[in-house]
Amino acid sequence: MSAEEVVRLSGGRMSFFEGIYRETRPQFASWRLFNPVTLDESRIVVKYDVDIKLDSLSDQRVKDQVLTLIGPKMILSFGLWNWRESVTSTAYYSKKDEKPYFDSLASEFGERPCGYAEMINWFIYRNLKQRSVLNKHALPMRRNAIEYTEPVPKMFWTIEEETKSILGYECQKAETDFRGRHWTVWFAPEVPIDGGLWKFSGLPGLIMEASSADGFYIFTIVSIENKAMKIQSYPKVETQRLTRERFRALEKAVYASPISGGIFDQEKGQDYMIGSHITAGEPKDTDTKIFTPNTYLGLYFPMELE
């Protein structure tokens, strides 16, 4: 039986070798978003669904949502449910006078829909005046973040004549190669906003759909509305500021072995995790396992491959 067949039949819960386990999806710890700093206020809020392929060996896919806040000075694009979980956690640990603000923020988006997960780990702050992008990422099993700043990336688009209607807007097709992935997007010239999703830029209209040629990422717009929301940074989140090269190397290493130096080590001084990561075919009462950095492997599916 091929590796692909093993993964598919196991539903993603499996070990290639006895005692070596692979997580089914990243496990992000909540951030504490105390004392947020307001950078701008949105005029437009856009929500996207994202359908993600978890790895090249499996047919398993999972959904998340991305929220983009578009203001006069800044555009912020981030994983909605990862952020909301942090907001909820912050409300729980807040002082009495701060709790109502975070409770209100969490309740605004309701509960995470069934079938959706906290997969998108990035916060992309695009400064329109400085023409710079701050990339801030959560890491599996860590409360700290990593970040780097770069100029707004240059994307060289081929704009096609093909059109289609999305949410009542006539959209045009465009394609580009960017850092290891080939992207096809649909943008709406009627909404003259450069970008809107992630760090896509250089098109004369809001991104309505985007998909990678390898099928790992499919973004589809859900809603667009005129809405004021604070675009905030979170200075109390412990953050490592790195070069892009160091950022990518560290992120890859953490995803590959999330337990090593993770939250259990940081908060309990232990380099192992006790849990119930059941693999396909094991008895249901097999509920206690000890995972170490050498026996618990992660998945890595970055937006940028280069």
Give, region by region, the residue ranges found by the protein language model:
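Tryptophan-centered motif/residue detector
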Residues: F156-W157, W186
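Structural motif
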Residues: I166-L167, F178
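Extracellular or lumenal secretory-pathway regions
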Residues: S2-K154, E160-T163, E170, F216-E306
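Gly/Pro-enriched, hydrophobic low-complexity segments
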Residues: Q172-P235
